[in-house]
Amino acid sequence: NNLPSHSEVIQLYKSRNIGRLRLYDPNHGALNALRGSNIEVILGLPNVDVKHIASGMEHARWWVQKNVKDFWPDVKIKYIAVGNEISPVTGTSSLTSFQVPALVNIYKAIGEAGLGNDIKVSTSVDMTLIGNSYPPSQGSFRNDVRWFTDPIVGFLRDTRAPLLVNIYPYFSYSGNPGQISLPYALFTAPNVVVQDGSRQYRNLFDAMLDSVYAAMERTGGGSVGIVVSESGWPSAGAFGATQDNAATYLRNLIQHAKEGSPRKPGPIETYIFAMFDENNKNPELEKHFGLFSPNKQPKYNLNFGVSERVWDISAETNSTTSSLISEM
């Protein structure tokens, strides 16, 4: 409840050489603050609006007019994320039948607005959709969600848009510390941990990412790229959540983002969650994902100013996430 103003946040992005941002909802205060900033944006269409948008093109046209066209080209919107972590196996299952119709309607509305070559339409998913992730080459979607994931992958393939994926080695490690080592989760393993044919894995992030690539390939989406739309590590509030672990993970993720994974070498567009600690979030660990304190002081000694790297940040009405892409 004590976060900086929208204009202060955008100024912080610019001062830290942060070149992209994710907004989880079309907050007009944030969008107005972004005008003329040259910061590229992932603009979220919230879950609560997905059913409405799916119900008719007139709703999609209105949403695009009010939240995209009214700010374009002053705000450089790069992607629209239609929903976040909608899944048949979570509390969002009631929205699953509306996911693809909403994607299609927003895609058509963006095309009608003359922005089809500028803005890609996608959705953000989490790892609960993956049934098998080990070894990474055997990655596959859960059989009971294929009816949901296959049409999404097909839509992204046909429209040449990437899948947005939230990847958190922290949760895999904290949920199974007996099987997953901390160094493997923090990018600090001294040796190969997983040998998968000719591919070698020294960190869990790559293994998780490549399992999603394999899953998409198995469903006809071998040409679909991935943007890591969230990743981070909490500094307090739960098992393994310490200041040192968070600093190590973030520092190594920043460095690793320019390298790519064994399956897909090259820069990985990766968004760090979150920009600020937030005292109103629950459970406790959700309060401690920030790169910065609400007073804009950095929690970690992270280098945002390397000339060949552009940092991205994403923001909610109440929270911010930061993302990195390198070798621009």
Swiss-Prot record:
Domain of life: Eukaryota
Induction comment from the UniProt entry of this chain: In response to infection, elicitor, ethylene, wounding.
Alphabetical GO biological process terms: carbohydrate metabolic process; defense response
Organism: Solanum tuberosum
Broad EC category: hydrolase
Enzyme active site: E85, E230
UniProt function note: Is thought to be an important plant defense-related product against fungal pathogens.
GO cellular component: vacuole
Propeptide: 306-328
EC number: 3.2.1.39
Sugar-modified residues: N318
One Pfam family, short name: Glyco_hydro_17
Family classification: Belongs to the glycosyl hydrolase 17 family.
Reactions this protein catalyses: Hydrolysis of (1->3)-beta-D-glucosidic linkages in (1->3)-beta-D-glucans
InterPro entries in UniProt: Glyco_hydro_17, Glyco_hydro_17_plant, Glycoside_hydrolase_SF
Recorded GO MF terms: glucan endo-1,3-beta-D-glucosidase activity
SUPFAM superfamilies in UniProt: (Trans)glycosidases
Protein location: Vacuole
Protein name (record): Glucan endo-1,3-beta-glucosidase, basic isoform 3
PANTHER family, A to Z: GLUCAN ENDO-1,3-BETA-GLUCOSIDASE BG1-RELATED-RELATED
Swiss-Prot/TrEMBL keywords: Glycoprotein, Glycosidase, Hydrolase, Plant defense, Vacuole
